[in-house]
Amino acid sequence: MIIIQDTFVCKPGNASRVAKMFKEAMASDPHLVNVMTDVTGQYNRVVIVSQFNNLSDFEKNWEAMSHPTKEMEESMKKMQGYQEMYVSGAREIFRTW
């Protein structure tokens, strides 16, 4: 099992909006575990946590996004404009034991 953690450092005042966008757009994604915002540490962070059986499944998920279904296209529409709401980001991949 692997855990994917995507962290976005948002522009001030945008973290809650970005978190809401992700929560709504990814509501039907079976891999989504949590959408979180910071309480301590660096300000204005949104963390998206997803879970996959292995890296191969994660890669297949990315490939599927290049040929989106109608449902995926609707999710992508909900995310329009989020790129302007954050300044940086990072992805970490963890293996569970």
Residue ranges and their predicted role:
Residues 1-74, 78-97:
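Short S/T/G/P-rich N-terminal loop/turn motif that feeds into the first structured element of a domain
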